[in-house]
């Protein structure tokens, strides 16, 4: 018995291997045959779909309007150019429509195809109305996707990079907000032939990737969608519009423009505290601050398009320029009255000297006339001549000469204009800043959105 059991234990695994290996080979062959059959079925379905198919004709020609459902997924938004008034956007652009000619029956419900099939069927002639430049990505192969359902519904997706126009109104710059549109529609088909419809609700038809913002100077507040019809000489066309709402960040401009302007105005007001006789110092303050404001105003305009109206920053710079220039005019006024005071002291001293010289000359002339009149009589009368000699011998007592008063080098007191300016200028400039920032920072952004 033991011998028989050991013999069975040896032969049983061999029998299992002999039976399993052929079965496994048969299953593999069956699966391979099924794969070949599927490939053959796919090929036959595609050949049958394209047999007699004319991609020059739209679906439902002569019977119904072709409805194209669209949605957009934004992978990258930005940058935005203020000078060119344009922005760059990278999207997955998706379109879905139904073509009865592409219905099929088979073991699968969806045919997943690449871009080679897209060139053999009809696709919408969609273009971007406000696009300056559009690029379809082709590395390493054209980035296109095509799916055909058994009921003839097609999904066509492509990756695009679009440079589009973004009209900007810069009256509130740099506290401004903008709505950049992306408009697209059919180039050749009117509303009676092809119409566009958003696939989902407004919040889902246009989506932006969480890390898709490429903006340094803006915040992307959100997006909205719309639809409109435009008329032209060739008919009416459907235009789909997606608006991207942007709010400018003010931090860069505060550091680069606003703070330097404020510091320049404060520096110009330091001259009110200098002595009004310090002409060189106050002149340097005034001229330097005026030139600095001129440079700041020029540099602030370099980052903006050449618009014909004044922006909020222009108004701020203009007021700062007015304060700086007024400080220079204030010094000129103070200096003018200071010069008149010094000139008056000098004239009074000169006039006193002239009066003293005139009185001395008058006394000398009177004495000379008296001597000339009595000279002949003295020579005839010996008594008078003796008296005259005795009278002329002693020298008259000289009166001590009064030294002319020297010009007093007095220092002018603080000008009343300077005293007033020390209070008026800072108060006015502070009030202006309060009104300016309260007005623009609390203003709701106005976004121009077309219907």
UniProtKB/Swiss-Prot annotation:
Residues 396-408 have a biased composition (Basic and acidic residues). Coiled coil: none annotated. It is found in: Postsynaptic cell membrane; Cell membrane; Cytoplasmic vesicle membrane; Cell projection, Dendrite. It catalyses: chloride(in) = chloride(out). Residues 29-249, 442-451 are extracellular. Residues 333-420 are cytoplasmic. CDD domains: LGIC_TM_GABAAR_alpha (cd19052). Residues 389-408 are annotated as: Disordered. Disulfide bonds join 166-180. Glycans are attached at residues 38, 114, 138. GO terms for molecular function: benzodiazepine receptor activity; GABA-A receptor activity; GABA-gated chloride ion channel activity; ligand-gated monoatomic ion channel activity involved in regulation of presynaptic membrane potential; transmitter-gated monoatomic ion channel activity involved in regulation of postsynaptic membrane potential. One of its GO terms (cellular component) is GABA-A receptor complex. Its main location: membrane. Expressed in brain (at protein level). GO terms for biological process: chloride transmembrane transport; gamma-aminobutyric acid signaling pathway; inhibitory synapse assembly; synaptic transmission, GABAergic. Belongs to the ligand-gated ion channel (TC 1.A.9) family. Gamma-aminobutyric acid receptor (TC 1.A.9.5) subfamily. GABRA2 sub-subfamily. The extracellular domain contributes to synaptic contact formation. The GABA-binding pockets are located at the interface between neighboring alpha and beta subunits. Alpha subunit of the heteropentameric ligand-gated chloride channel gated by gamma-aminobutyric acid (GABA), a major inhibitory neurotransmitter in the brain. GABA-gated chloride channels, also named GABA(A) receptors (GABAAR), consist of five subunits arranged around a central pore and contain GABA active binding site(s) located at the alpha and beta subunit interface(s). When activated by GABA, GABAARs selectively allow the flow of chloride anions across the cell membrane down their electrochemical gradient. PANTHER family: NEUROTRANSMITTER GATED ION CHANNEL. This is Gamma-aminobutyric acid receptor subunit alpha-2. It comes from Rattus norvegicus (Rat).
């Amino acid at each position: 018995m033991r011998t028989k059991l050991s013999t069975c234990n040896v032969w049983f695994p061999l029998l299992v291997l002999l039976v399993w290996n052929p079965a496994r080979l048969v299953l593999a062959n069956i699966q391979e045959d099924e794969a070949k059959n599927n490939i053959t079925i796919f090929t036959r379905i595609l050949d049958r779909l394209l047999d007699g198919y004319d991609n020059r004709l739209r679906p439902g020609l002569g019977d119904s309007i072709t409805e194209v459902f669209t949605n957009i997924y934004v992978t990258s938004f930005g940058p935005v150019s203020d000078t060119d008034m344009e922005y760059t956007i990278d999207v997955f652009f998706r379109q879905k429509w139904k073509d009865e000619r592409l219905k099929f029956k088979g073991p699968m419900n969806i045919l997943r195809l690449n871009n080679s099939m897209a060139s053999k069927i009809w696709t919408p002639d969609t273009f971007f109305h406000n696009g300056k430049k559009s690029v379809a990505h082709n590395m390493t192969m054209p980035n296109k996707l095509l799916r055909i359902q058994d009921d003839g519904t097609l999904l066509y997706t492509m990756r695009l990079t679009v440079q589009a126009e973004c009209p900007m109104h810069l009256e509130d710059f740099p506290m401004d907000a903008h709505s950049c549109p992306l408009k697209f529609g059919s180039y050749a088909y009117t509303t009676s032939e092809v119409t566009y419809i958003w696939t989902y609700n407004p919040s889902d038809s246009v989506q932006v990737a969480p890390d898709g913002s490429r903006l340094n100077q803006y915040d992307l507040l959100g997006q909205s969608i719309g639809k409109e019809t435009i008329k032209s000489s060739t008919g009416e066309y459907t235009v789909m519009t997606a608006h991207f709402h942007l709010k400018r960040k003010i931090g860069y401009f505060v550091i680069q423009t606003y703070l330097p302007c404020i510091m320049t105005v404060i520096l110009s007001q330091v001259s009110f505290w200098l002595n009004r006789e310090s002409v060189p110092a106050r002149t340097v303050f005034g001229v330097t601050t005026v030139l600095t404001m001129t440079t700041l105003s020029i540099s602030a305009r370099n980052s903006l398009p050449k618009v014909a109206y004044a922006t909020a920053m222009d108004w701020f710079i203009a007021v700062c320029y007015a304060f700086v220039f007024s400080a220079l005019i204030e010094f000129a006024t103070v200096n003018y009255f200071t010069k008149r005071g010094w000139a008056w002291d000098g004239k009074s001293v000169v006039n006193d000297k002239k009066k003293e010289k005139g009185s001395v000359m008058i006394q000398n002339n009177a004495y000379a006339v008296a001597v000339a009149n009595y000279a002949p009589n003295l020579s005839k009368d010996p008594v008078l001549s003796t008296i005259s000699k005795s009278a002329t011998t002693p020298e008259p007592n000289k009166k001590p000469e009064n030294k002319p008063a020297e010009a007093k080098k007095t220092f002018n007191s603080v000008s009343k204009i300077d005293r007033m300016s020390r209070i008026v200028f800072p108060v006015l400039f502070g009030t202006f800043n309060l009104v300016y920032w309260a007005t623009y920072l609390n203003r709701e952004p106005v976004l121009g959105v077309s219907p």
